[in-house]
Amino acid sequence: MVLGRVPVVVYRRDWRYLRVLLEGVRAMAVVDQAILAHTETMKLSSAELARQLVQHLGPTVVAVTAGVRDKKLPYKWSADGGPVPRDGALQRLQVAHRAWVAIATSEGADVARAWFIGANPRLDEQPPFLAIAAGKFKPVMSAAAAFVDGTDN
């Protein structure tokens, strides 16, 4: 018997055993969406990353999220061949992109923007973009996951 590309040899004809074996293989085959979003974000150029965030969140939110004072800098980052965000700013932009993609994919762009700029009880009533600026990456990603999977209700 072949399951996907993995040959499975059933030594016993016990169907309960086969069912447990197949459930284990299916569980291993499930792609973690968080890892997939991380991979897709990491493959974006810094210009494309900034461009998408500016388009959906606006330059002011992107600048604050990245921890820069110049509100025009996100536009400059968006230009091909333009300046590149520093490492700390790029890291914050990547986390913001992952959170935005998770929510926008599930709920839509307008809901994702509202989630990003609104007070969040999981973040002590702080908006997620400010929490990212403060370096609270894990709580923001946990809040985004809770919002997407419905445990935020």
Predicted region positions:
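Non-transmembrane "mature" sequence context
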Residues: 2-153
